[in-house]
Structures are given as structure tokens and as C-alpha cells.
Swiss-Prot record:
The gene is xseB. The lineage of its organism: Bacteria, Bacillati, Cyanobacteriota, Cyanophyceae, Synechococcales. It catalyses: Exonucleolytic cleavage in either 5'- to 3'- or 3'- to 5'-direction to yield nucleoside 5'-phosphates. This is Exodeoxyribonuclease 7 small subunit. The keyword ATP-binding does not apply. Gene3D superfamilies: Exonuclease VII, small subunit. Keywords: Cytoplasm, Exonuclease, Hydrolase, Nuclease. It comes from Synechococcus sp. (strain JA-3-3Ab) (Cyanobacteria bacterium Yellowstone A-Prime). GO terms for cellular component: cytosol; exodeoxyribonuclease VII complex.
Length: 78
């Protein structure tokens, strides 16, 4: 039985590194206009995904803080 390799899950840090690489390619001056637009579009899409990820994580942190505050109130009731 062969094992399938798991695809690496999306990672914020890797996405930011990808955007930095795309920006470096754009700034190099070695691409033609069509390639510049393509790289710019890739960077914009990746940054949009990063923003969505950060918003999701912000909401998760807010929920955790609310739970901790509730737990603290419960302990103070004793």
C-alpha cells in the first residue's frame, strides 16, 4: 500500500515570503509588462488571502479572550 504525501497546509509566513519574492521580481526590471501585471495579480490575491487569514485568527483570539474572561468571572464567584 502506498502512502500519499500530504500537501502542506497553507501557511501565512510562506505566503508573505511568496509576496516578497513577487515584489522582488517586479522591482528587478527584468520582466515585461505582461509578466509584471501577472506577478502583481498573484501578489494581490495572496495578500487578500493573508488578510482573510488574519481576520479569522483575530476573531478566534477574541473568542478565547471572552472565554478566559468568563472563566475568571466564574472563579471570582467562588
Amino acid at each position: 500500500m502506498s502512502r500519499r504525501k500530504r500537501e502542506d497546509p497553507w501557511r501565512y509566513e510562506a505566503a508573505i515570503a511568496e509576496v516578497e519574492s513577487l515584489i522582488a521580481q517586479i522591482e528587478s526590471g527584468e520582466l515585461d509588462l505582461a509578466e509584471v501585471v501577472e506577478r502583481f495579480q498573484q501578489a494581490a490575491q495572496t495578500l487578500k488571502r493573508c488578510a482573510e487569514f488574519l481576520e479569522e485568527k483575530r476573531q478566534q483570539v477574541e473568542i478565547l479572550i471572552e472565554e478566559l474572561n468568563q472563566d475568571d468571572e466564574d472563579w471570582q464567584a467562588f
